[in-house]
């Protein structure tokens, strides 16, 4: 009996079929593990891609390059650089979070259009209450598609970082016929004294009486120099009890922008270069995709560009009272003519 058992054991050890089965089983296990790893990686990559940027979701393609309007063909001026500026209604450090939504709202929005071919700069002021398509996300960053609401919320629905910035860029691009808007500068309320100081303080003419009760010296038509104590109110204050009070704030922002650009044009290039280096002190309050080299190139263009108060344009349209908030509705025909005038040339 014992001898028989030993023969069976020897036969089992030398049986190639058993070895083959073991090898096959191991290969199957490895294949399953590999498949699972690949599947998990793909799902994670898909998830991340949905969370990275609105710019990845919205591809402008080439459709904007050539358009036809009222029978006339137009070609996009490829020597234009577009930079979006937005001031958001928050204080403290600007930083992204893993949870999307409920972020700051873009209170002031402007597109800087630098036309190197015609040596001019235009600033297109965009009402924050403009009703247009913006991108929404779930709380964990999944893309929910486009939704029509106030353009200022394009930043709010993102992550408070790059996604928010690029969502706002996308909203402006969609509003303006898919023109490319890739560069941006976003600041919050705590940045204002630093921005003012970069230009050595700004002196301007007050355009309205909105602030006269708090600042008697700020009567319409008065010349004032803004300092740390007044800059935030001048650029941000509005009477929330009054309908369309954002219009008065936009008038003050326009006056400030005009004076600021004129001051920068009067500075020499060395001082403007130092201004970039000084931005380090406001790192916590600024988000930008503009590199140092791009900034220096823009500075040179700025020095040569034609710029007056008339170089600041406002989005054409009308104010309306909405169910919850004021709304600004664009005049589509006037907007199309503005787009052609700013960005296109006849073929």
Residue ranges and their predicted role:
Residues 2-28, 35-347:
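Non-catalytic, solvent-exposed segments at the cell envelope interface
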């Amino acid at each position: 009996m014992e001898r028989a058992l030993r023969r069976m054991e020897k036969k089992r050890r030398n049986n190639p079929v058993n070895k083959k089965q073991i090898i096959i089983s191991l290969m199957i296990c490895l294949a399953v593990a590999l498949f699972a790893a690949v599947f998990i990686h793909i799902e994670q990559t898909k998830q991340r891609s949905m969370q990275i940027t609105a710019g990845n979701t919205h591809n402008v393609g080439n459709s904007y390059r050539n358009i036809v309007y009222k029978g006339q063909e137009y070609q996009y001026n490829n020597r234009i650089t577009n930079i979006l500026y937005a001031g958001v209604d928050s204080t403290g450090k600007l930083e992204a979070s893993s949870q999307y939504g409920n972020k700051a709202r873009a209170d002031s929005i402007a597109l800087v259009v630098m036309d190197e071919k015609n040596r001019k700069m235009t600033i297109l002021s965009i009402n924050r209450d403009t009703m247009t398509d913006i991108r929404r996300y779930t709380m964990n960053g999944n893309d929910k598609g486009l939704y029509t609401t106030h353009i200022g919320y394009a930043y709010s629905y993102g992550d408070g970082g790059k996604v928010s910035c690029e969502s706002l860029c996308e909203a402006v691009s969609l509003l303006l016929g898919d023109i490319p808007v890739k560069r941006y500068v976003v600041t919050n309320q705590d940045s204002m004294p630093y921005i003012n100081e970069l230009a050595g303080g700004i002196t301007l003419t007050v355009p309205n009486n909105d602030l006269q009760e708090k600042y008697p010296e700020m009567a319409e038509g008065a010349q004032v120099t803004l300092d740390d104590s007044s800059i935030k109110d001048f650029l941000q204050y509005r009477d929330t009890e009054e309908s369309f009070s954002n219009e008065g704030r936009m008038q003050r922002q326009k006056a400030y922008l005009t004076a600021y650009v004129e001051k920068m044009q009067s500075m020499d290039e060395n001082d403007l270069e130092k201004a970039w280096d000084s931005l380090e002190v406001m790192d916590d309050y600024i988000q930008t995709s503009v590199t140092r080299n791009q900034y220096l190139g823009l500075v040179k263009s700025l020095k040569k560009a034609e710029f007056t108060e008339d170089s600041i344009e406002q989005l054409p349209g009308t104010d309306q009272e909405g169910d919850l908030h004021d709304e600004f509705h664009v005049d589509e025909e006037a907007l199309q003519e503005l787009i052609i005038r700013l960005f296109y040339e006849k073929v």
